Amino acid sequence: MRRRYSHDPPGSFRETKVFGFRGEYGCKALVDLLAGKGSQLLQVRDKMPDSPLGSQSNESRIPKHSEALLSRVGNDPELGSPSHRLASLMLVEGLTDLQLKEHDFTQVEATRGVWHPARVITLDRLFLPLSRVSIPPRVSLTIGVAGVGKTTLVRHFVHCWARGQVGKGFSRVLPLTFRDLNTYEKLSADRLIQSIFSSIGEASLVATAPDRVLLVLDGLDECKTPLEFSNTMACSDPKKEIQVDHLITNIIRGNLFPEISVWITSRPSAAGQIPGGLVDRMTEIRGLTEEEIKVCLEQMFPEEQNLLGQVLSQVQANRALYLMCTVPAFCRLTGLALGHLYRTRLAVQDIELPLPQTLCELYSWYFRMALGGEGQDKEKVSPRIKQVTQGARKMVGTLGRLAFHGLVKKKYVFYEQDMKAFGVDLALLQNTLCSCLLQREETLASSVAYCFIHLSLQEFVAATYYYSASKRAIFDLFTESGMSWPRLGFLAHFRCAAQRATQAKDGRLDVFLRFLSGLLSPRVNTLLAGSLLSQGEHQSYRDQVAEVLQGFLHPDAAVCARAINVLYCLSELRHTELACSVEEAMRSGTLAGMTSPSHRTALAYLLQMSDICSPEADFSLCLSQHVLQSLLPQLLYCQSLRLDNNQFQDPVMELLGSVLSGKDCRIRKISLAENQIGNKGAKALARSLLVNRSLITLDLRSNSIGPPGAKALADALKINRTLTSLSLQSNVIKDDGVMCVAEALVSNQTISMLQLQKNLIGLIGAQQMADALKQNRSLKALMFSSNTIGDRGAIALAEALKVNQILENLDLQSNSISDMGVTVLMRALCSNQTLSSLNLRENSISPEGAQALTQALCRNNTLKHLDLTANLLHDRGAQAIAVAVGENHSLTHLHLQWNFIQAGAARALGQALQLNRTLTTLDLQENAIGDEGASSVAGALKVNTTLIALYLQVASIGSQGAQALGEALTVNRTLEILDLRGNDVGAAGAKALANALKLNSSLRRLNLQENSLGMDGAIFVASALSENHGLHHINLQGNPIGESAARMISEAIKTNAPTCTVEI
């Protein structure tokens, strides 16, 4: 057999052998075996020891069967590799509406090329039970879009099985394709087995356990007759000849061969023919990751690194191309087309040759490659092209007619009778052009099957045929009989094609219409002029076609996939004004007024294709309920969705709940902050969380869900196992609401971030949360700030911290906690080994509480972030903290701003910094440490090698303190951020800092805002930057410089340090 595989270059075929057996007894034995008559066969074998079945052991026959399979699938070294990308599949629970109803391209585009998070199953476990109490699947179904590698997967599995790497429970694997089955009108189970084993010179099957046979049926989408399970008569007789589709239906049902395992591969849309109840296991082949795309292209250009870099750059720069390149077959086609383009650029030395921006432009380059147009000048048609133009046009015309009618009839595999019926000259099918478009394959019935290398090529060729035929046709080209109401002129036929495409429920004409539109774009006309198109003929149609397309953007309640496809068609036509205007409105924040059907459709299109919607689609302050409702079908596929501040009320949550409940839902993060959501809206969202399996982050801050809404969400958390982050900040849930949430945390083991700030939570709520923390094993961050838990609430949480060894971040800001509460918290911190961040801002911690903090910090080795801002530490408390800083070996961030700290405490902290080797951030702003305190800290900077950020805003620092800091910066090589805003360093201080900048190489940000620098001070700093190339940002605002002088200094800084951003 001559077979061409998807990863082989165009025009290449492999010689392979079809394996089988002969002998009436052997066939009967196998059929009986598969039909569930194993015991009878064993008895017959025992009575006939001289038979082939009784004379050879099973072990001796299996190697021969394996050798035959290896011969059939070839010896590609990649097959059988444990690192093969098809070594694992995704377990899925069923087909989604998107898979059942939409074109393969639409599936990839709508999901942004990101596959649904799913459980992964390795190939060696594909047919094994998932648990100890389950049974192996009898019928397995693997789905994947066109070109993703379903046949390659089958070959990979067969190769691995033949080498004993997978499927060790099977003694026989019987692979068969629907291309083979299409050659039969009727077939019995008996003849089916004979057709598989027709060429091995002995009966190679023996009586074995019947469940050790795997029948593989590859390519259900290529079956010429749809499977109709409801209208097919049951048949259990393996000798009875019935229609092939009935035979397959009865095998899947188990009426025939009930003991064997059946594995079917299919495109998603065709897989819907099989009732879900008959499928025991469904898997999906994922597309290529970014790294796998790179590897795929590297394999195409192993010795052309420059070319590889150019192709990769173009793919990564064009979002539409990148998304489709997640499909391996398309990735290879793209590589071939772009490789030819860049070679042509090099040959003609024309770097301005335009790069493809649309699919039609890409396929036009592929056609140029197929026509052999290397070295073609962009202004002229090469002699070689001229020589093949007439023959190519005729061949493409006949192939196009075949492709078009196949597309209309959902036919993707053609046989010799089909080729002859459409006037295809079989003798010419081996030329370069045809080998780039078609692949040829011999079937088991010794006939020849043809199909286009990829479905999209069939659609492109069909579009070229329709484009040419519609100029002279007087009847509807979609009508099989050729008779219809007269349609005169290209526009009438284009309108007909657009109507057919937009009315098709399965989207099978979507990409065809895109290509048909793209053939009218100026670039495509230039690329194909003289070969497939006539020069300039697009000009008279282009604007009118754009009007026709825009006429299909109806004011429907929801934007459907067909409407979005119209935007794709306009993009192919290079008529992008509508999409660009909406995209610009999104960037500028003026989207709120764009509510027309065309604007909504363009917005849905941009959700798929625009970088502005990736990784997050931000629709804050711009959506109404009506617009949101129209976008719902497309919001399903957003990874991250921000809908803040849109005045959404409870009815909108019912709509969003329906989206989150959908099987297709891919939303992982959704923010609904600052809307008007009440408890009814929260309940609607909670109902969706009961079934949703994608959402990991839900932000409901600043709404009004109250205790009833919190209870509904808490009940959902008892069942939901995907949500990891929930924000209920500012929702007035009070103690009653937090009690329900705490109860849910006892059983929920996935929530890791819970935000309950500003919810009027008191002692009772804190106690309930503390009890939950003693049992919860997942929560890592609890945001409890701006409530009223007081000391007793803090004591309850402290008791929980003695038990809980999971929580890492605890925020108790502004909770009326005094020394008593802090003291108990610190005792817990002495034994707790997981808490790394503690926020005690805006409480009432005095020097006595600071003493307890010091004792804890000297013993604790896990706390890294401690925030004591706006407490009552004074010098005595800060000095106590300084003792801990000198001894602690884990703290990295310490915030002491606004604590009435003066020079004495700053001196103690300076001494501690000379000993500390972990602190990277110290914040002392709003403390009157003065020049003396600044000098003490500066002295520490001369020896400290870990501090990165120092905040000294509004710290009463004058020129002397600035001079001390300047001296330290000439020595220090680690400090990157120095903030001196709101001090009074003056020109003298500025000069000292400027001199330091000439020598310092580590500082990246310097803030001298509001420091009375004057003109001279600003000039000192600006001049110093000519010798400093490390500073990235400097702020000189709020200094009495004057507008003209500020402009001059800004220009000077930009000249001296072009990489430095200046605010002045």
UniProtKB/Swiss-Prot annotation:
LRR repeat copies, ranges = 338-362, 570-593, 632-662, 664-687, 692-715, 720-743, 748-771, 776-799, 804-827, 832-855, 860-883, 888-911, 916-939, 972-995, 1000-1022, 1028-1051
- Please give the knockout or disruption phenotype noted for this protein: No visible phenotype under basal conditions. Mutant mice show an enhanced response to lipopolysaccharide (LPS)-induced endotoxic shock. Herpes simplex virus 1-infected knockout mice exhibit enhanced innate immunity and reduced morbidity and viral load compared to wild-type animals. Mutant mice are hyper-susceptible to colitis-associated colorectal tumorigenesis.
Cited InterPro entries: Leu-rich_rpt, LRR_dom_sf, NACHT_NTPase, NLR, NLRP_HD2, NOD1/2_WH, P-loop_NTPase
Compartments it resides in: Cytoplasm
One MF annotation (Gene Ontology) recorded for this entry: phosphatidylinositol 3-kinase regulatory subunit binding
Q: Superkingdom of the source?
A: Eukaryota
| Ranges that cross the membrane | none
The record's keywords, sorted A to Z, are: ATP-binding, Cytoplasm, Leucine-rich repeat, Nucleotide-binding, Repeat
One GO term of the biological process aspect: negative regulation of interleukin-6 production
Which Pfam families has this protein been placed in?
A: LRR_6, NACHT, NLRC4_HD2, NOD2_WH
What tissue specificity is annotated for this entry? Expressed in bone marrow-derived macrophages.
All copies of domain NACHT, residue ranges: 138-459
Grouped into one coarse class, the protein's main location is cytoplasm
Q: What SMART domains does the record point to? A: LRR_RI
* Record's comment describing the protein's domains: The leucine-rich repeat domain may reduce the interaction with TMEM173/STING.
| Similarity field | Belongs to the NLRP family.
Quaternary structure (record)? Directly interacts (via CARD) with TMEM173/STING; this interaction reduces TMEM173 trafficking to the perinuclear region in response to interferon stimulatory DNA. Also interacts, but to a lesser extent, with TBK1. Interacts with TRAF6; this interaction results in decreased TRAF6 'Lys-63'-linked polyubiquitination, but leaves 'Lys-48'-linked chains unchanged, promoting TRAF6 protein degradation. Interacts with PIK3R1/PIK3R2; this interaction disrupts the association between PIK3R1/PIK3R2 and the p110 catalytic subunit PIK3CA/PIK3CB/PIK3CD and reduces PIK3R1/PIK3R2 activation.
Name of the molecule in the record: Protein NLRC3
What are the top taxonomic ranks of the organism? Answer: Eukaryota, Metazoa, Chordata, Craniata, Vertebrata
What gene name does this entry carry?
A: Nlrc3
